[in-house]
Regions:
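Beta-loop-alpha module in the N-terminal Rossmann-like domain of NAD(P)-dependent dehydrogenases
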Residues: 54-118
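A structural signal for short, well-ordered beta-strand elements
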Residues: 4, 61-62, 130
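Short hydrophobic "strand-cap" motifs at the C-terminus of beta-strands
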Residues: 6, 102, 129
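N-terminal Rossmann-like dinucleotide-binding module
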Residues: 1-54
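Short beta->alpha connector loops
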Residues: 9-11, 81-84, 106, 132-134
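Short, well-ordered alpha-helices that flank and scaffold nucleotide-derived cofactor binding pockets
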Residues: 13, 17-21, 90, 94, ...
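A contiguous active-site-proximal alpha/beta segment in oxidoreductase catalytic domains
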Residues: 106-145
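A short helix->loop->beta-strand "cap" motif at the edges of active sites that frequently abuts
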Residues: 26-27, 95-97, 122-125
Length: 145
């Protein structure tokens, strides 16, 4: 399995650690980080500046989103700023990758319909991260819709 991470802030690193814990070294992890910062954010939200992300997480940094997508990831974890979620998800789906998009899906509704249509057209899974999916209020809302 090959996973591409777009954005390695605290939530991106949390998802990366979770994936490593679940799948171990069987996952080839690529990552693109636009700012190129070398900061590790620990589980208790401590920041280690100057840390080597590649050796810490056993990943390979790619220079651009396009370079990462050209490696045919099975899944792309989209953890960059919200305003970039939809364009990155569309690019990943277009490259044949399933997508996990961190919440919120976007900062506006532009192209959300296109994103849903592209996932359906390509037969790929598009998943939006949500920690409240089993909350009683959310369940009630789902039933009423």
């Amino acid at each position: 399995m090959k996973a591409l991470f777009v954005g390695l802030g605290s939530i991106g690193q949390r998802h990366l650690r979770n994936l490593r814990e679940l799948k171990g070294e069987s996952v080839d992890i690529l990552a693109w980080r636009a700012r190129g910062l070398n900061r590790v954010v620990t589980n208790i939200l401590e920041v280690e500046s100057g840390a080597d992300l590649q050796s810490r997480y056993g990943l390979r940094l790619v220079p651009t989103l396009e370079a990462g997508l050209s490696e045919n990831p099975d899944v792309t974890f989209i953890c960059n700023p919200s305003s970039l979620h939809v364009p990155v998800a569309l690019a990943a789906l277009g490259a044949g990758s399933h997508v996990f998009v961190e919440k919120p899906l976007s900062n506006n509704m532009n192209n959300v319909d296109a994103l849903i249509a592209e996932a359906e057209r390509a037969g790929l899974v598009g998943y939006l991260g949500s920690q409240f999916r089993f909350h009683p209020a959310v369940k009630c809302l789902q039933q009423s819709l």
